Every structure is written in C-alpha cells, then in structure tokens.
C-alpha cells in the first residue's frame, strides 16, 4: 500500500471510495492491519480500557500514547498514523502544542482532539504549525461524565443544528478530518455532505466517508462482555486475524458494513 496522506484521504472522499480505520497499539497489529489494507491506524485513548483495564479513557497520558505511537510506527506499512490527544492534554493552547508535538515526534501523522466548536482555536494553532488535526465530535468519551454516560448525541434538533454548525466551523478552522461517534445516521450524512474534508463514522451510519472500529471489538475481544450496537465481530468464520481485518476492509468498501442495525435513528 502506498503511503496514505491527508491528500490521498481527501482524494478518496472526492472519488467516493470508503476509508477504513482501526485502532492499533503495537507493531505486530500495525503490520497486520496495514498489510490488510487499512488506511488509517488510530492510537486511541481507548487503550486505557482495552489494554490497561480502566473503566474510561481518562487515565491515559500523553507519554503512554506516545509510547504506543512509536510501537505502531515500527510495524506500519504505509497507513496513516492518527494519535489521540488524551484527556486534558489540550487544557491550554501551550499544552495542546507541546503534547501534539510529542505525539508527532513519536511517529503520528495527524492528531485527534475531542470536542466541538470551542476546539477551533486549538485546531487553527496546530494547522498553522504543520500538524494535521482530526476533530472528534458527537459522543466524546473524554467528556463521559458531562454527557451522563455513553449515549447517542444529536437526537434533538437543537443539538443536531449545533453539531452541523460546529463541524463547518472546525473545518474552517483547519481540521483535516472529522470523526463522528454515536450520532443519528441522517445527521452524519448531512454533516458528511456539508464539509469538504473526510468524515469517519463509528455508530454513525453508512453515509460517512469511512468507518472506524476498536480493534478488540471487531475481533470479538471484550473483558466486560458488553458489545456496542455499532460493532460487528469480523473474526467469525475467519481463519486468522489478518483475514478478519481484510473482511472488515472489504465490508466497508463494498458498503455491506455498517448495516442499518449498526446505526442510530434521531
């Protein structure tokens, strides 16, 4: 696979080719997933839950994320490396810049930040300094205590209107990509059409420009036994992990995943 860049992701959106993304935390899985055709490897703060065993993503630090970014970089075969900026790592503009630089120096190609329109200043700061940014909107796990749990966002018309406006504002601030988590499928489609940058969905229907899942979820691995509605176990019927990841890539590309039952209504 040729090296995936911001430019190539934008070209995929323009051509209507779906983008595939998976979380990834080490060299072996980075090699396996990128060889299977996954375009974007996300070192998510989900590592706090699936690797460290916490009940939220909040305890994850920038240093821990940078460690896993470096591991992924060593095994990667051409995929874009996207790294989460952990909880409170962007509390001030100075912290945002320093922590983002740390992740980029570890091997990331793009930084993901969670929030809404208030992120505009941070995104502008990073973009002006050569750091591409993905804006994570909708259900933002770092704000789980404010949101009252892991709930679908944007069901009320006022919320939907605000989310559409925020997405446009963040694109204008310089966001190179948007990730929508747990939002109604119709709203996700509207946002995807409203912005020029690629929009990746998780629990956001099939009309987004691409999909992302947590690696452990799509392989059927869970400590809690709770499986989110938007997850499909791609390990079922497959002889090995790389085949399961290839099945995920194929399903996203041929529009068989996500199906209607993996999304949410308003």
Swiss-Prot record:
Q: Does the keyword Cytoplasm apply?
A: yes
List the subcellular locations: Cytoplasm
Catalytic reaction annotation: 3-methyl-2-oxobutanoate + (6R)-5,10-methylene-5,6,7,8-tetrahydrofolate + H2O = 2-dehydropantoate + (6S)-5,6,7,8-tetrahydrofolate
Pathway it works in = Cofactor biosynthesis; (R)-pantothenate biosynthesis; (R)-pantoate from 3-methyl-2-oxobutanoate: step 1/2
Cofactor binding, per record: Binds 1 Mg(2+) ion per subunit.
Key words of the record: Cytoplasm, Magnesium, Metal-binding, Pantothenate biosynthesis, Transferase
The kind of enzyme this is, by top-level EC class, is transferase
Cofactor needs: Mg(2+)
Instruction: List this protein's GO terms for biological process.
Output: pantothenate biosynthetic process
A GO MF annotation of the entry reads: magnesium ion binding
Q: Name one GO cellular component term.
A: cytoplasm
Q: What family does the Swiss-Prot or TrEMBL record give for this protein?
A: Belongs to the PanB family.
How the protein assembles, per its UniProt entry? Homodecamer; pentamer of dimers.
Q: What does this protein do?
A: Catalyzes the reversible reaction in which hydroxymethyl group from 5,10-methylenetetrahydrofolate is transferred onto alpha-ketoisovalerate to form ketopantoate.
Q: What is this protein called?
A: 3-methyl-2-oxobutanoate hydroxymethyltransferase
Q: Which gene encodes it?
A: panB
């Amino acid at each position: 696979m040729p090296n995936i860049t911001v430019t190539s992701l934008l070209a995929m959106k323009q051509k209507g080719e779906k983008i595939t993304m998976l979380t990834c935390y080490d060299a072996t899985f980075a090699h396996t997933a990128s060889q299977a055709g996954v375009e974007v490897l996300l070192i998510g703060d989900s590592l706090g839950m699936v690797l460290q065993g916490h009940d939220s993503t909040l305890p994850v630090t920038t240093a821990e994320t940078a460690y896993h970014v470096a591991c992924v970089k060593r095994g990667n075969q051409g995929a874009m490396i996207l790294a989460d900026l952990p909880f409170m790592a962007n509390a001030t503009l100075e912290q945002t810049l320093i922590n983002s630089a740390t992740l980029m120096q570890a091997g990331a190609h793009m930084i993901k930040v969670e929030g809404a329109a208030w992120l505009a200043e941070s995104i502008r700061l990073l973009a002006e300094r050569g750091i591409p940014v993905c804006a994570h909107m909708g259900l933002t796990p770092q704000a789980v205590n404010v949101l009252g749990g892991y709930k679908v966002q944007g069901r009320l018309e006022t919320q939907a209107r605000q989310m559409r406006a925020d997405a446009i504002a963040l694109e204008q601030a310089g966001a190179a990509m948007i990730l929508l988590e747990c939002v109604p499928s119709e709203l996700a489609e509207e946002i995807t059409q409203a912005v020029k940058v690629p929009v990746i969905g998780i629990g956001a229907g099939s009309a987004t420009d691409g999909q992302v899942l947590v690696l452990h979820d799509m392989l059927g691995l869970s400590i809690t036994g709770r499986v989110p509605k938007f997850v499909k176990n791609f390990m079922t019927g497959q002889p090995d992990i790389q085949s399961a990841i290839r099945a995920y890539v194929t399903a996203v590309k041929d529009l068989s995943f996500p199906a209607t039952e993996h999304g949410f209504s308003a």
